[in-house]
Amino acid sequence: MVTPNELVCTAAKHGTTTFIVDPHEAANVSGAAGIDYILNQTEKSPANVYVMMPSCVPSTSVDDNGCVFSANDMYPYVRNQRVLGLGEVMDDPAVIHAEESMFVKMNLFENRTIDGHAPYLPNKELSAYKMAGVDTDHEATTFEYALEEVRRGLHVHIREGSAAHI
C-alpha cells in the first residue's frame, strides 16, 4: 500500500494526467478526515486529482462501518474546486423510495455530476433512479443492460478492471 501522493506520482511518470476518485472507503473508516487526507496528500501532485463526494457512508442503512457521513458533513466540500460531484450512489432503494437524507445529499450537488451504482435494476426502478437525478453508472456488464441505461438517459462508464470480464 502507498500514499495517495506516491500513487499519483508513479502513475504520472507513465502518462496518467488526471484522477477522479471516490474515497468512500476512506470515509467509511474515518469520515471527513479520510477525505481531507486524500485532498491534502494530492494537493501538489504532478497530476490533477479530483474527488467525488462519497454518497453512501455507510453503504446502506443496515451497514455498521463505524462512520456516518451526512449531507451536513458534505456541505464544507461543496465549494471545493477539486470536488466534482456526488460519488457512486450505491443505496438505490434510498433513491427509488425518495428517502429525504439521500435527496438532501443529491441536492447539494444538483448542478454537478451524480455518479450511480445500479447493478441490474428492473426497468421501472432504473427509470426512477435516473429521474431522481443520477447521471452515470458503471455497473453495466452486458450490452443489453448498458443499452437500457442509455435509453433512460444515463451515461454509461465502460468498466475495465479485474472483475470486468467475469
Feature annotation, model-predicted:
Residues 2, 27-29, 163-164:
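Acidic-and-aromatic substrate-binding clefts and catalytic sites of carbohydrate-active enzymes
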Residues 88-166:
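Active-site core of metal-dependent hydrolases
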Residues 8-113, 154:
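Divalent-metal coordination cores built from histidine and acidic residues
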Residues 1-8:
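Di-metal (Zn2+ and/or Mg2+/Mn2+) metal-binding site signature of metallo-dependent hydrolases
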